[in-house]
Amino acid sequence: MTTRLLLLADTHVPKRARDLPAAVWSEVERADVVLHAGDWVDERLLDALGSRSRRLVAVWGNNDHGALRERLPEVARVQIEGVRFAVVHETGAAAGRERRCAERFSDVDVLVFGHSHIPWDTTAPSGLRLLNPGSPTDRRRQPHCTYLTVVAHEGRLGDVTLHRLAR
């Protein structure tokens, strides 16, 4: 079986946008699993995404407080199609990230993270794949708002695609 995943982080709704872009909601409808790496800001988006997703795996971020921290873990771990994922918001500075994350998440194949709003796709020497989808609502110093789609099949990742949203 093939499983289609949507990777999101740093949505900051309603602070950075009133809602997720229509293209992201379309991806939610197509995805088998949505992974969200935190910074929701408002619990209403968690409820909306939870009700519209087939399956949601999510964590809280540094801008999430109160009910969001009560409802979500700091780190989530899930196995999908034989691929072991961890989801976390904060991984620290870019310098040394692969080494730090490979040590902290030695039991997973893929780490999905957020916080920087900067898309990231690297593989640590240990084999750990690190993916940051950027932000679909707040591009910061990036030219575009972004998100990732990924396909998991028979223990492997494929079709890792960074989607750039029009301003």
Residue ranges of each PLM-predicted region?
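Active-site environment of divalent metal-dependent phosphoester hydrolases
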Residues: 12-16, 40-45, 63-69, 92-98, ...
